[in-house]
């Protein structure tokens, strides 16, 4: 709980057996989280079994793998159903430190922002944290291009550490988004489309053996999807196209 607002952490999980408990323990150690929602996207390991042993959790298991974006759709749906006022996504692979949860929750709970990102780029230590060089370069290039198309000034669009207000999540047309990794990018573009300011806090970078990552071919597909999303945003702003991602909001 923060300022009488219910704080819910959502964890989109896939084969996270080795790191789930460690991540969960650190999340709860922050003393502001009321509930953790874990959605297992048909893992091949014991992620679901580990999750069900954790207190103060709601566990949902997809019977078949539906994709990272679809996992998040379930996460946010459940969070809203549970009465969440502040929703924070933390990956259960321990790549993002849960120690930033109080800061992110305070920025939402005090009404300063409706969306806060944990940026690995702001601190300038992404490479020192073992982010692969090709990922760093692609992150910087994509972010530069996306800022041009959207008019924003974010340091990165590609972090999986995010906090949202209930008010914001209820406005987003998330069902129109991809079920794959580009969901993340589409979501941020939709937030900007609505006219919200996105805040950022510096987040340490941690890449290690157990941290989840996508291969080069899927990274390429994701990158192209990000550019297409940003282009659609600009064309829709110019009223040259209509897009289900960016409908006319009244």
Where are these regions (language model features)?
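Short hydrophobic beta-strand elements that form part
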Residues: 8-12, 37, 61
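Conserved short acidic donor-positioning loop in nucleotide-sugar-dependent glycosyltransferases
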Residues: 27, 41-42, 66, 75
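Acceptor/aglycone-binding surface of glycosyltransferases and processive sugar-polymer synthases
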Residues: 62-81, 98-181, 208-217, 224-227
């Amino acid at each position: 709980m923060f300022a009488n607002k219910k704080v819910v952490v959502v964890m989109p999980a896939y084969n996270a057996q080795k790191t789930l408990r460690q991540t969960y323990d650190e999340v709860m150690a922050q003393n502001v989280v009321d509930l953790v929602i874990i959605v297992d996207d048909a893992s091949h390991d014991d992620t679901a079994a580990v999750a069900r042993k954790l207190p103060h959790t709601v566990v949902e298991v997809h019977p078949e793998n539906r994709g990272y974006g679809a996992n998040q759709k379930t996460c946010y749906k459940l969070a809203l159903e549970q009465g969440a006022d502040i929703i924070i996504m933390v990956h259960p692979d321990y790549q993002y430190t849960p120690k930033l949860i109080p800061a992110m929750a305070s920025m939402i709970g005090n009404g300063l922002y409706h969306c806060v990102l944990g940026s690995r780029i702001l601190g300038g230590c992404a490479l020192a944290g073992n982010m692969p060089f090709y990922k760093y370069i692609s992150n910087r290039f994509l972010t530069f291009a996306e800022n041009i198309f959207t008019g924003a000034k974010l340091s990165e669009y590609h972090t999986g550490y995010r906090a949202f207000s209930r008010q914001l999540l209820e406005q987003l047309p998330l069902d129109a988004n991809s079920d794959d990794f580009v969901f993340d990018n589409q979501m941020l573009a939709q937030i900007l489309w609505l006219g919200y300011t996105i805040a950022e806090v510096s987040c340490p970078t941690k890449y290690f053996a157990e941290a989840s990552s996508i291969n080069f071919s899927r990274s390429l597909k994701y990158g192209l999807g990000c550019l297409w999303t940003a282009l659609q945003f600009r064309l829709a702003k110019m009223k040259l196209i209509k897009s289900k991602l960016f409908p006319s909001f009244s």
